[in-house]
Regions:
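A short pre-motif secondary-structure segment
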Residues: 204-207, 246
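Short amphipathic alpha-helix used as the core "switch/output" element in two-component signaling
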Residues: 61-74, 230
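Two-component/phosphorelay signaling modules centered on CheY-like receiver
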Residues: 8-29
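Cyclic nucleotide signaling catalytic output domains
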Residues: 251-280, 286-311
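Short regulatory alpha-helical coupling segments
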Residues: 130-131, 144-163, 194-201
Length: 312
């Protein structure tokens, strides 16, 4: 387990590092709280923070609150506050500000090691729970709820200087694949598509449900179309052999964030563009600015939604 240790005294840092069993944990020592925060923000491998109450720049209590806010609910971090005083008010304050444990300073060696073993167990369990709660088990991509949580934040942070585009796509004739080759083959398709997407982009990628996926990319419309084309070709190149050889294609709709857009609005335009790709031959990319979003598109899309439980 990687541990961020914060204390203004280098002597205390060295002594604490020596107390921790070598080989079981890696200690990153800091004299200032802000430097520790920067490390935690940049390194997802840090799973524990041990801090003294008195620091050179901010207090240990402030560091607790800032670190807890930084990692949020999507990353495990076990926080231990240590102090040489027996001030129970300080214990309460630390726990109320995000600490998980409180220990005397200097700690008894066996007590410190036992608490770190507990922290290791808890953060590993939390990591698994977070994974199960935020990812789609079949594809390894973000699940619908987590995707929309991240997408809303991305839309709120978008502006003319930081473009954002949505690439919405689904598997062509996926129901036929399940009906013809069986659901095991359908699952294999979804797993392979997830693997393609994880290597194709560093954007926000989620499975919205069934055979529908979305990628939010920090780029303008033209670049997003290029990304979509690259993904389309990669998916088209996939080959499956069970129970007999077959391939798949996907249809893509691309839309760029516009001032005042919510995630629902940008996905609506991408959705209509994707239906246009379906309606004009499948296995293609359609950008939302390449055709007028007329009432006819809305009417056709509404009919398709009503008459077909699954897109083809």
């Amino acid at each position: 387990m990687r541990i961020a240790l914060v204390d203004p005294s280098r002597a205390i840092q060295r002594a604490m590092t020596e107390l921790i069993v070598p080989g079981e944990h890696e200690v990153l020592a800091f004299s200032e709280g802000q430097k520790a925060l920067n490390c935690i923000g940049a390194d997802d491998g840090v799973r524990a923070l041990i801090t003294s109450v008195q620091l050179a720049d901010i207090s240990g209590i402030q560091l607790c609150a800032a670190a807890r806010k930084l990692v949020g609910s999507r990353r495990p971090l076990f926080i231990i506050v240590m102090s040489s005083t027996n001030d129970y008010g300080l214990v309460v304050q630390a726990l109320d500000n995000g600490a998980d444990d409180f220990i005397r300073k200097p700690p008894f060696p066996e007590e410190l090691r036992a608490r770190l073993r507990a922290a290791d167990r808890l953060t590993l369990m939390q990591r698994d729970l977070i994974k199960y709660a935020t990812t789609d088990s079949l594809t390894g991509l973000l699940n619908r709820r987590t995707f929309f949580d991240d997408a809303v934040k991305a839309c709120n942070g978008a502006d003319s200087a930081s473009p954002l585009s949505a690439i919405l796509f689904d598997i062509d004739q996926f129901k036929r694949i399940n009906d013809t080759y069986g659901h095991q083959a359908g699952d294999a398709v979804l797993e392979s598509l997830g693997a393609v997407m994880r290597t194709a982009s560093s954007g926000i990628i989620g499975r919205l449900g069934g055979e529908e996926f979305c990628l939010l990319q920090s780029c303008d419309l033209a670049d997003a179309v290029e990304v979509a084309e690259s993904v389309r070709r990669s998916i088209r190149a996939l080959r499956f052999t069970q129970p007999e050889p077959f391939g798949i294609t996907c249809s893509f709709g691309v839309a760029e964030w516009e001032r005042g857009d919510t995630i629902d609005r940008i996905l609506r335009r991408a959705d209509i563009a994707m239906y246009e790709a379906k309606n004009t031959g499948r296995d293609r990319v359609v950008a939302s600015d390449t055709f007028a979003l007329t009432d006819q598109h809305e009417k056709w899309r509404g009919i398709a939604r009503t008459t077909s439980p699954r897109r083809q």
